[in-house]
From Swiss-Prot:
Gene3D superfamilies the record matches: 1.10.10.200, 3.30.70.980
Assigned keywords, A-Z: Cytoplasm, DNA-binding, Transcription, Transcription regulation
NCBIfam families listed in its UniProt record: PRK00110.1, PRK12378.1, YebC/PmpR family DNA-binding transcriptional regulator
Keyword Membrane: no
Gene Ontology biological process: regulation of DNA-templated transcription
Stored Pfam families: TACO1_YebC_N (PF20772), Transcrip_reg (PF01709)
Stated name of the protein: Probable transcriptional regulatory protein BRE_29
Recorded superkingdom: Bacteria
GO MF terms held by the record: DNA binding
Organism: Borrelia recurrentis (strain A1)
Coiled coil location: none
Subcellular location: Cytoplasm
Length: 243
């Protein structure tokens, strides 16, 4: 078991959730509804829906909102057809970005993403130009205020986890993308996770000084503010106390 989590800075800290709550909720509702429409409204038998609902719970979305989003999806009242898009790009200083989008208008989304990048000094890359720098991993996180660390570790290893990281009041179980569902299902029989998702993890990270890091984080924030952007993965080394 490793002592320090390599996951703690994979995705940029979003700051105060309240400031962006409406935008975040809108994106999550869309994701939940589409997952329900594609795979049904049963969370236990629809992995994509389960992941979407878990994200909503982490964001403190009210249960009523989640249920309405599921009903909207299975009722097929969504209107427009939605598409999943992935853009590979570069921010400043060679930082690689993978931008995951969910949209009902491909041209609008492409224009918005391209505009943010060009105005900020970044650029879109060709397919494959960035994706080779990342690999998929499963992340399942637990709060140690609720459970005993040794019990989580024991069951996680028995279930086939690749690694386990302990930091502060959190234990993070790492799995392969293929084993994520089976490991998380086994752990769920005894523990309720705080986070459960499949994410893109960089093979290595780019270290910058504070001024450079802040510029890159500003680009990521602008991309995340786009209505159609669901996730922005990057290989920036984020250091909170950098001088």
């Amino acid at each position: 078991m490793s002592g320090h989590s390599k996951w703690s800075t994979i995705k940029r800290k979003k700051g105060t959730l309240d400031a962006k709550r409406n935008k975040i909720f809108t994106k999550l509702i869309r994701e939940i509804s589409i997952a329900a429409r594609m795979g049904g409204g049963d969370i236990d038998s629809n992995p994509r829906l389960r992941l979407a609902v878990n994200k909503a719970r982490v964001a403190n979305m009210p249960k009523d909102n989640i249920e309405k989003a599921i009903k909207k999806g299975i009722g097929d009242n969504m209107g427009s057809e939605y598409f999943k898009l992935t853009y590979e790009a570069y921010a400043l200083y060679g930082v690689a970005l993978i931008i995951k989008c969910l949209t009902d208008n491909k041209n609008r989304t492409a224009s918005e993403v391209r505009s943010v990048l060009s105005k900020s000094g970044g650029s879109l890359g060709a397919p494959g130009s960035v994706s080779y720098m990342f690999h998929k991993k499963g992340l399942i996180s637990y709060n140690l205020d609720k459970y005993h660390e040794d019990e989580i570790i024991e069951l996680a290893l028995e279930a086939g986890a690749e690694d386990i990281y302990s930091e502060g009041s959190q234990v993070e179980v790492i799995t392969s993308a293929d084993n994520f569902e089976s490991v998380s299902s086994i752990l769920r029989t005894k523990f309720e996770e705080d986070i459960a998702e499949v994410a893109l993890v960089p093979e290595s990270k780019v270290a910058l000084d504070k001024e450079q890091m802040d510029k890159v984080l500003a680009i990521i924030e602008k991309l995340e503010d786009c209505d159609d952007v669901q996730e922005v993965y990057h290989n920036l080394e984020i250091v909170d106390d950098i001088c």
